[in-house]
Amino acid sequence: MFEFITDEDERGQVGIGTLIVFIAMVLVAAIAAGVLINTAGYLQSKGSATGEEASAQVSNRINIVSAYGNVDTSGSTEVVNYANLTVRQAAGADNINLSKSTIQWIGPDTATTLTYDGTTADAENFTTNSIKGDNADVLVDQSDRIEIVMDAAEITTNGLKAGEEVQLTVTTQYGSKTTYWANVPESLKDKNAVTL
C-alpha cells in the first residue's frame, strides 16, 4: 500500500518554512475572499436602495389637470393676481404630500422657490384646497384633486400681465418634478378668470 522511496533524489522534503508560507497564503486568500463577499453585499444593498429611490422619483409624480388665473380688474390695467393649478396623482404613484413639496416659479421678473403654508399664499408660500377627496394637502387616490394656490401679485411685481408666461416646476417629497408653463392670454379685458 505504501511505497518507500529510498533514493534521495526522488524524495520531497517539506520544511517548516514552506509550511509557514503555505499557511500564510491560505490566510491571505481567506481574508481576500471575506473582503470580496462583504463588498459584494454592500454593493448589492446600495444598488437596491438606489433603484428604489430612482423608481420613486419616476413613479411618484403629479399630473397637472388644469390651470387658471383670477383676474384683478381694480387697477388701471387687468392682471392675474392668483395662479391656480389643479393636480392629481400620476398613474402608479404613492401618496403625495403637497405640504412637503416645493414649487419653483420662474416668471417674467422673478425667480423664487415657494414652500407650503396651510393658511395663506404669499411671496414665499403657496397653499392648497381640496377639490375632491378628504385631504387638502395629500393626494391619496388617483381620483383626488387638489388646487394649488399661488399669489402672483405678491410673487411678481403687481401680478401677471396679459401675454406673460411663468414656468412652474412642482417637486414632490420624492424628488420627482413636473413642469408646467402658465401662459396668460393676450387680453384680460372684461374677464374674472382665465385659463393659463
UniProtKB/Swiss-Prot annotation:
Keyword check for Ion transport: no
Domain of life of the source: Archaea
A Pfam match: Arch_flagellin
GO MF entries: structural molecule activity
Keywords carried by this UniProt record: Archaeal flagellum, Glycoprotein
Main location (coarse class): other
Full protein name: Flagellin B2
Lineage of origin: Archaea, Methanobacteriati, Methanobacteriota, Stenosarchaea group, Halobacteria
